[in-house]
A protein has these predicted regions:
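Active-site phosphate/ATP/adenylate-binding loop shared across adenylate-forming ligases
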Residues: 2-176
């Protein structure tokens, strides 16, 4: 392990930031050879939001494995009570802005969700159109409405736990 660490040192976002900024400005063949489809932004809970370049092949791999892994995680941990039901995936597909060169910037999951929209009805309670709603409160209401109608609701998930907490607080607030 020490040899590996010596030859491949650990890095962090700061080490790549100037390259990512160049990519955001439209420069190609930096860090990746494919075109950047979109930049996912982090939640910013640990500081300034970071941009993560997403390519077609990276998005396909991430979407495929995230969907499979999340379903498998739920099954492995709740198999005695698993009902093979859908889950409430609190996510959106709203593009928040664009880079100077016109590349979309959205939450890290938005770009991937757009590309798997055909699978969404089989895995999640909310239709894809709910994920397109820009008003966060309206979107939370709709996600909850569809989830509460699902008799075999198996799980509630989101990429960011803070979104699940917001959703549950919203439910408590509006329960009456």
């Amino acid at each position: 392990i020490e040899d590996y660490i010596e030859h491949v040192p650990l890095s962090n976002y700061h080490d790549y930031e100037k390259y990512i900024n160049r990519m955001a400005n439209g420069e190609k063949n930096i860090l990746v050879s494919e075109d950047v489809e979109y930049f996912g932004h982090t939640s910013g809970t640990t500081g300034k939001q970071k941009l993560i370049p997403a390519t077609k092949s990276g998005r396909i791999a991430a979407s495929k494995y995230m969907a499979i892994l999340s379903q498998r995680f739920v099954y492995n941990n709740f198999k005695e009570n698993f009902k093979y039901g859908k889950g409430l995936m609190f996510a959106d597909t709203v593009t928040t802005t664009y880079t100077k060169s016109g590349i979309p910037i959205c939450s890290a999951t938005s770009g991937g969700m757009k590309k798997i929209k055909g699978l969404i009805p089989y895995m999640y309670t909310s239709p894809y159109e709910v994920m397109e709603v820009k008003d966060k409160e309206a979107q939370m209401y709709l996600h909850l409405l569809f989830a509460l109608n699902e008799r075999k609701l198996s799980y509630i998930t989101s990429v960011f736990i803070s979104n699940v907490l917001d959703l549950l607080r919203f439910l408590e607030e509006k329960i009456d």
